[in-house]
Amino acid sequence: MASYTVESFVAQQLQLLELERDAEVEERRSWQEHSSLKELQSRGVCLLKLQVSGQRTGLYGQRLVTFEPRKFGPAVVLPSNSFTSGDIVGLYDTNESSQLATGVLTRITQKSVIVAFDESHDFQLNLDRENTYRLLKLANDVTYKRLKKALLTLKKYHSGPASSLIDVLLGGSTPSPATEIPPLTFYNTTLDPSQKEAVSFALAQKEVAIIHGPPGTGKTTTVVEIILQAVKQGLKVLCCAPSNIAVDNLVERLALCKKQILRLGHPARLLESVQQHSLDAVLARSDNAQIVADIRRDIDQVFGKNKKTQDKREKSNFRNEIKLLRKELKEREEAAIVQSLSAADVVLATNTGASTDGPLKLLPEDYFDVVVVDECAQALEASCWIPLLKAPKCILAGDHKQLPPTTVSHKAALAGLSRSLMERLAEKHGAAVVRMLAVQYRMHQAITRWASEAMYHGQLTAHPSVAGHLLKDLPGVADTEETSVPLLLIDTAGCGLLELEEEDSQSKGNPGEVRLVTLHIQALVDAGVQAGDIAVIAPYNLQVDLLRQSLSNKHPELEIKSVDGFQGREKEAVILTFVRSNRKGEVGFLAEDRRINVAVTRARRHVAVICDSHTVNNHAFLKTLVDYFTEHGEVRTAFEYLDDIVPENYTHEGSRSHSCAPKPKCPTTSVRKPASAQESRQEARAATGHSRRKPSEKPLGSQVQPQHSSKANGSDRTGGTDRTEHFRAMIEEFVASKEAQLEFPTSLSSHDRLRVHQLAEEFGLKHDSTGEGKARHITVSRRSPAGSGSATPQPPSPPSPAQAEPEPQVEQPVGQPHGSTQLDLKALHLERLQRQQGCQAQSQLGGGSRPQKAPQKKKKKEPKGPAMALPSEEDFDALVSAVVKADNTCSFTKCSASTTTLGQFCMHCSRRYCLSHHLPEIHGCGEKARAHARQRISREGVLYAGSGTKDRALDPAKRAQLQRKLDKKLGELSSQRTSKKKEKERGT
């Protein structure tokens, strides 16, 4: 064995662990010194105002204390937090700053948390059910000590069952040739060829085998088959993973195969479905179970007596009795543990749970024949060495193309701490030790193809059973635009939906993307998709909090988490919000390619990505994702949602609430009132010059070319140019004729109709699009005369460069972020708003040439021609005056009251109304007002009565509790005085 290699490796790992440990301690210290308790709770590292709800004795005599939120009730839950089983926590009294005790968190649910305290705190820890406490997450000394101990053991390891394995893993020797094994009879007959090959390969290898399982390829199924085949050969297997969830997943699968399995770890840390296989449960079924139970009961009784007595001599006797009982308990439990371990075919534990500090210290050094480490790519290499030293062979399973091990120290991560054992061996030995599973059973083929090309060298394929499945194929789900596509990109580029800039730059948020997510989820739910089948993934905790505030009340089953919380999970639909949108093009946390791979591959049937393409395209890997979605998916711009989302930096004219009765409209908008958000998005596409392309459609001459096409003016566009000229000729002929209207056939495509809309606008004609689906058609008609102008529209003269409008640029492919012919969506939208404003002003000026006897009110009712149709010599000052006058008039339909002196501004639609119509429920903003009130209540957690202030009266329950506490205290003082008085009387 190359001792120098071992020594240098151990020295490097210890140095990296020390950096990580120091960074973790410094982070905790900084939080405690510079953050308030509420800030710590918002960070997820502190739980406030807890009460003791129960105490009992657990395994090895540990004291288990259950804490719950102070206010009891069915709806009271713990706040969002980052506590997990195994965390070291500090216990504090709410009214004191000193720490009462240190314990290990063994179980946490939405409503309670259980902490285990060792025997050293038994007599110092006196917890009162009436008091309130807080728990603070501390740096995990236990894990650090176990990792350090394993590395030091490796350094001193000279002879033993793992000697050859250590040589191979540290580069002292090459892997031995595979041995010949007889043909296998598989327990699982549905394994695909790549899975069967991986099983045979793992069993044939002498020292090490790596099973590379990309998302959805059945890695756990393959690992279970390997374990069963090893047990069949008479081998003793130790199976580990870095997390309790991963270990419990294997326990559930192995339990179905009726093998003797034993799960190490306290049952409070395990899933309920596997607790029967825990060491504690097995011991409870053993011959010594009743004796052990009697000893524990005796310990609890002695604790009770010790708590009641005040005599020091009796307390000392009780302590000695407890020590003797614990000694007997330990001896009987160890004998039962050895018996249980020997009877098991497979022993399962976390990496750190397999240390010599636990039950495995009772077994011989060479007891196990093979060690299996699942999810190895997520584990620190130092943690893997804890179980690896217990057997001559190891089988590693995982995916090093997904999330790496979690670290706090950026310096340690760059120096190699975040590089897993699996990744290091795969790069060093390649195919000699690695077999990859090539068929996935989760994702639609469009999702699979991107992951395969981006991360897995094109080797990953979709099984036919999932290759074409979509959301619309689920029971009860309708066929809509959202449910019929596997890939959807909502691009916020140029829409003003910028990220929130935090001072500490620790986390980012994007309220605009939150609103887009909300609208898309509502569209999916309206189509019949269950909220529990949808996941929202964000890379930043601040964005996760914003999403939960907006969505959790309405959709409680909806899962909203960070990327790290979703590895190993899957959902029918996944919505990704990338958050980053800034002028510098900084992507920050998104630069981790493996993080994006995990996020995208959580979806089975539908992935929606919401991002700013201008920002994310500055990162090469993210640009490949955007380009792929553009080529194979459906692309929308956030402008399609402008009826529901208005960027904060837009003026109020752009927010035309569809809940109000419409004012006269300019011709760029449809004359029909939108019946749904989907229809309003279609109108927005027509107004901004965008049409969408579904992945199944080929780019034809009459359709917009996909973004990836480079033939903007080539032969592929000839057909589109010819059709435009054909439509232009038809409209010119109509203008020259005396016909009142021109109807176009229903056979026109959506883009053909867009061309007709644009041409009609050029000629100053009225253009209406009516009908639904295949019955949709366009009618072009003449406008009413404006002022003294002619009723016959004139063909437009060629515009000068200064007058040129951006409409002809609509042929530019959608979504290209760079290029000289880039279509500026924001400029188009602002121009549309300007035209709408001009239309409104013209409606105020249009009656100037009518007889004086006509009433002024009558003139305001009649819509006039658009601003674009006004003569070029129109007095600009008059136009401005008209706009100002319109702005000082009540925005409610059929109301001409002035709002110059007495008017109210509506925060929901950004308009002014007179006192008769200023209430949101009257002028059409009632729903928005109710939504705002709900959001405020959800955010502040306080229900306000009208516009009054918060009721600061003492809560009746709290008052009653304090009264009971006072009465109890008075009773105790009274009894003490009575007893002293009696003693005094006896003395006399």
From Swiss-Prot:
<dbReference type="InterPro" id="IPR001374">
    <property type="entry name" value="R3H_dom"/>
</dbReference>
<comment type="function">
    <text>5' to 3' helicase that unwinds RNA and DNA duplexes in an ATP-dependent reaction. Specific to 5'-phosphorylated single-stranded guanine-rich sequences. May play a role in RNA metabolism, ribosome biogenesis or initiation of translation. May play a role in regulation of transcription. Interacts with tRNA-Tyr.</text>
</comment>
<dbReference type="GO" id="GO:0036121">
    <property type="term" value="F:double-stranded DNA helicase activity"/>
</dbReference>
<feature type="short sequence motif" description="Nuclear localization signal">
    <location>
        <begin position="857"/>
        <end position="861"/>
    </location>
</feature>
<dbReference type="Pfam" id="PF13086">
    <property type="entry name" value="AAA_11"/>
</dbReference>
<keyword id="KW-0694">RNA-binding</keyword>
<feature type="binding site">
    <location>
        <position position="917"/>
    </location>
    <ligand>
        <name>Zn(2+) 1</name>
    </ligand>
</feature>
<dbReference type="GO" id="GO:0048471">
    <property type="term" value="C:perinuclear region of cytoplasm"/>
</dbReference>
<dbReference type="GO" id="GO:0000049">
    <property type="term" value="F:tRNA binding"/>
</dbReference>
<feature type="modified residue" description="Phosphoserine">
    <location>
        <position position="797"/>
    </location>
</feature>
<feature type="binding site">
    <location>
        <position position="923"/>
    </location>
    <ligand>
        <name>Zn(2+) 2</name>
    </ligand>
</feature>
<dbReference type="InterPro" id="IPR047187">
    <property type="entry name" value="SF1_C_Upf1"/>
</dbReference>
<comment type="subunit">
    <text>Homooligomer. Interacts with RUVBL1. Interacts with RUVBL2. Interacts with GTF3C1. Interacts with ABT1. Interacts with ribosomes.</text>
</comment>
<feature type="binding site">
    <location>
        <position position="441"/>
    </location>
    <ligand>
        <name>ATP</name>
    </ligand>
</feature>
<keyword id="KW-0007">Acetylation</keyword>
<keyword id="KW-0804">Transcription</keyword>
<feature type="region of interest" description="Disordered">
    <location>
        <begin position="943"/>
        <end position="988"/>
    </location>
</feature>
<dbReference type="InterPro" id="IPR041679">
    <property type="entry name" value="DNA2/NAM7-like_C"/>
</dbReference>
<dbReference type="GO" id="GO:0005524">
    <property type="term" value="F:ATP binding"/>
</dbReference>
<feature type="binding site">
    <location>
        <begin position="213"/>
        <end position="220"/>
    </location>
    <ligand>
        <name>ATP</name>
    </ligand>
</feature>
<dbReference type="GO" id="GO:0003697">
    <property type="term" value="F:single-stranded DNA binding"/>
</dbReference>
<dbReference type="GO" id="GO:0021522">
    <property type="term" value="P:spinal cord motor neuron differentiation"/>
</dbReference>
<keyword id="KW-0687">Ribonucleoprotein</keyword>
<dbReference type="InterPro" id="IPR050534">
    <property type="entry name" value="Coronavir_polyprotein_1ab"/>
</dbReference>
<comment type="similarity">
    <text>Belongs to the DNA2/NAM7 helicase family.</text>
</comment>
<dbReference type="GO" id="GO:0043025">
    <property type="term" value="C:neuronal cell body"/>
</dbReference>
<feature type="compositionally biased region" description="Basic and acidic residues">
    <location>
        <begin position="949"/>
        <end position="971"/>
    </location>
</feature>
<dbReference type="GO" id="GO:0005634">
    <property type="term" value="C:nucleus"/>
</dbReference>
<feature type="binding site">
    <location>
        <position position="925"/>
    </location>
    <ligand>
        <name>Zn(2+) 2</name>
    </ligand>
</feature>
<keyword id="KW-0067">ATP-binding</keyword>
<dbReference type="InterPro" id="IPR004483">
    <property type="entry name" value="SMUBP-2/Hcs1-like"/>
</dbReference>
<feature type="binding site">
    <location>
        <position position="402"/>
    </location>
    <ligand>
        <name>ATP</name>
    </ligand>
</feature>
<keyword id="KW-0238">DNA-binding</keyword>
<dbReference type="GO" id="GO:0030424">
    <property type="term" value="C:axon"/>
</dbReference>
<dbReference type="Pfam" id="PF21138">
    <property type="entry name" value="SMUBP-2_HCS1_1B"/>
</dbReference>
<feature type="domain" description="R3H">
    <location>
        <begin position="721"/>
        <end position="784"/>
    </location>
</feature>
<keyword id="KW-0597">Phosphoprotein</keyword>
<dbReference type="InterPro" id="IPR036867">
    <property type="entry name" value="R3H_dom_sf"/>
</dbReference>
<feature type="region of interest" description="SS DNA-binding">
    <location>
        <begin position="637"/>
        <end position="783"/>
    </location>
</feature>
<keyword id="KW-0175">Coiled coil</keyword>
<keyword id="KW-0010">Activator</keyword>
<dbReference type="InterPro" id="IPR027417">
    <property type="entry name" value="P-loop_NTPase"/>
</dbReference>
